[in-house]
């Protein structure tokens, strides 16, 4: 992860990226778990 000292913390792209990734990943994992549970219950 070599971003370079030319970009200070005034541009928090890592925070936005972290928020977006978690906002998309957490519900995805929850949905996958719910679907898997439903499939196992139906079977």
Swiss-Prot record:
TM stretches of this protein: 18-34
Domain of life: Bacteria
UniProt keyword annotations, A-Z: Electron transport, Heme, Iron, Membrane, Metal-binding, Photosynthesis, Photosystem II, Thylakoid, Transmembrane, Transmembrane helix, Transport
Binding site for heme: 22
Membrane topology: Single-pass membrane protein
GO molecular-function terms, A-Z: electron transfer activity; heme binding; iron ion binding
Cofactor comment: With its partner (PsbE) binds heme. PSII binds additional chlorophylls, carotenoids and specific lipids.
S-S bonds: none
GO BP: photosynthetic electron transport chain
Annotated localization: Cellular thylakoid membrane
InterPro entries: PSII_cyt_b559_bsu (IPR006241), PSII_cyt_b559_CS (IPR006216), PSII_cyt_b559_N (IPR013081)
CC terms in the record's Gene Ontology section: photosystem II reaction center; plasma membrane-derived thylakoid membrane
Stored Pfam families: Cytochrom_B559
Cofactor: heme b
Complex formation: Heterodimer of an alpha subunit and a beta subunit. PSII is composed of 1 copy each of membrane proteins PsbA, PsbB, PsbC, PsbD, PsbE, PsbF, PsbH, PsbI, PsbJ, PsbK, PsbL, PsbM, PsbT, PsbX, PsbY, PsbZ, Psb30/Ycf12, peripheral proteins PsbO, CyanoQ (PsbQ), PsbU, PsbV and a large number of cofactors. It forms dimeric complexes.
Function: This b-type cytochrome is tightly associated with the reaction center of photosystem II (PSII). PSII is a light-driven water:plastoquinone oxidoreductase that uses light energy to abstract electrons from H(2)O, generating O(2) and a proton gradient subsequently used for ATP formation. It consists of a core antenna complex that captures photons, and an electron transfer chain that converts photonic excitation into a charge separation.
Family stated for the protein in its record: Belongs to the PsbE/PsbF family.
The protein's name: Cytochrome b559 subunit beta
Organism listed in the record: Picosynechococcus sp. (strain ATCC 27264 / PCC 7002 / PR-6)
Phylogenetic placement of the source organism: Bacteria, Bacillati, Cyanobacteriota, Cyanophyceae, Oscillatoriophycideae
